Amino acid sequence: MTATLERRESASIWGRFCNWVTSTETRLYIGWFGVLMIPTLLTATSVFIIAFIAAPPVDIDGIREPVSGSLLYGNNIISGAIIPTSAAIGLHFYPIWEAASVDEWLYNGGPYELIVLHFLLGVACYMGREWELSYRLGMRPWIAVAYSAPVAAATAVFLIYPIGQGSFSDGMPLGISGTFNFMIVFQAEHNILMHPFHMLGVAGVFGGSLFSAMHGSLVTSSLIRETTENESANAGYKFGQEEETYNIVAAHGYFGRLIFQYASFNNSRSLHFFLAAWPVVGIWFTALGISTMAFNLNGFNFNQSVVDSQGRVINTWADIINRANPGMEVMHERNAHNFPPNLAAIEAPAVNG
């Protein structure tokens, strides 16, 4: 009898835990995805902060020339970064217990791999948690679908690209200047500026910013007046009120007269679908472009593609970019190789002496 009561009590505790995890009445929704999201994101954040402040230099190129990235080793907020895991480790799974000591783990850039893998798992669980909460509230799943765009972009630069290049040392450093360095090197090695998927991503990001600004300004400029002409239109509203505060017909009419009639939306759902879909699809394409360039399916190379009737080259902007790429590549890993492969492959001229 005693054993039966204890079993019921334990089942009751588990049931209460399940109800708490899946409850939509709590201040912050946990969810089953949150059970995994919380520890992984806390781990990634904690290790990032500690490593950004105090991590010793990392032998990123695997040639015994460590690169400093932390604040205590001479960097500031702009130049500081979590240095990627050493090329000597490659794509090997490198937890702390795989190293002979913590010093060796730090020297080989172990924190980068730890942060990146926990972060990617955490943001994927956050996306799942968005779907889970939407499902329990009876909502449609498009919030999680929209969030899949930045998740795909992060996965591309932190996981797919290193896999394609054969080493986590080619992943994006976790810092401001490290991000810019990654972008410059990516251009030098893959000519991303001439890749159509990157162009779609730029159109998505900048177009999304433009449309967001246009929509926000139209909404805040077309209030339904609840006051007299002698009072401010803002006086008729309370922050967070349930009643509609703007007139989409007025906004549609204004924008239609500003450009032309069919340039504006007269349906709120169509408008907001467009505002969500434009940047999301653009970022999806960018992530796909990074993932294909990871395996060296690079951007277009229109090298000296325009010539006159005499066969003389007429330079285009594509040629200017091609001229800049080797220079950027020379600056990258300057001690790992003397010249980029496309320069080193050229036969050296004979020197008479």
Swiss-Prot record:
Q: Where is this site: Tyrosine radical intermediate?
A: Y161
Which is an annotated GO molecular function term of this record?
Answer: oxidoreductase activity, acting on diphenols and related substances as donors, oxygen as acceptor
Residues recorded as binding a quinone, renumbered to this chain, are: H215, S264, F265
Catalytic reaction equation(s): 2 a plastoquinone + 4 hnu + 2 H2O = 2 a plastoquinol + O2
Tell me which UniProt keywords the record has, alphabetically.
Acetylation, Calcium, Chlorophyll, Chloroplast, Chromophore, Electron transport, Herbicide resistance, Iron, Magnesium, Manganese, Membrane, Metal-binding, Oxidoreductase, Phosphoprotein, Photosynthesis, Photosystem II, Plastid, Thylakoid, Transmembrane, Transmembrane helix, Transport
Q: Which GO terms describe its cellular component?
A: chloroplast thylakoid membrane; photosystem II
Positions of [CaMn4O5] cluster binding = D170, E189, H332, E333, A344
Which top-level group of life is the source organism from? Eukaryota
> Which residues carry the site feature described as Stabilizes free radical intermediate?
H190
| Enzyme category, top tier | oxidoreductase
Subunit info here reads: PSII is composed of 1 copy each of membrane proteins PsbA, PsbB, PsbC, PsbD, PsbE, PsbF, PsbH, PsbI, PsbJ, PsbK, PsbL, PsbM, PsbT, PsbX, PsbY, PsbZ, Psb30/Ycf12, at least 3 peripheral proteins of the oxygen-evolving complex and a large number of cofactors. It forms dimeric complexes.
Leftover remarks? 2 of the reaction center chlorophylls (ChlD1 and ChlD2) are entirely coordinated by water.
- This chain's protein is named Photosystem II protein D1
